[in-house]
Amino acid sequence: DGQIPIQLKLGAARVYDDVRMAAKTGCDSIYIDGMEGGTAAGPHIATEETGVPGIAAIRQARNAIDDVGMTGRISLVYAGGIRNGGDVAKAVALGADAVAIGHSSLMALNCNKDIPEADYPAEMGVEAGECYHCHTGRCPVGVATQDPELRKRLDPDEAAERVYNFLHTLTIEAQLFARACGKTNIHSLEPEDLAALTMEASAMAGVPLAGTNHTVGVEDYHHL
């Protein structure tokens, strides 16, 4: 009935084919999770050795949406490794309509922070900054837990202010990135505003190597 937006979330794997199929379902947006995404509940082999990098996933997803004629009708949301405004701006330039943020917001909440109330070695068997035990429900800073005593370690008002400051700063950084590219709106960013520093990045993102007009994998190569 058009009252509730429907979003499909996909892990970045066979991105182009998956997004093409998803786009035909009539959903409102497609959420792509790149391999850079952080989670404390997944095994190391899954979080570090599987998935498709964001710069490749975004371009493939955008091409898929465009190719099925759903441009402007289905929004592309990207998540995975968004840590600062530069990450946001680059994702938008590559074709994302929006980004989603998870792990970095947890950091702003106090995740993994060495606070006086938390004894990481005694409580978790690890040092502060190396916790990653969200799934156990024993979060020493009170973020990922339902334990009443542990929850007291998190001040909701202070935590909300930290998250606000993080998101506000991230927004300002993204705007500065757009201005540096001569754009008045971050959504005006496009691939031509980017340059790749490695051959791999050029091939995956479909943008020229810095200082050249050459995009790896594209035959028409012209020297500046």
Indicate where each model-derived feature is located.
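C-terminal extensions of enzymes
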Residues: 147-224
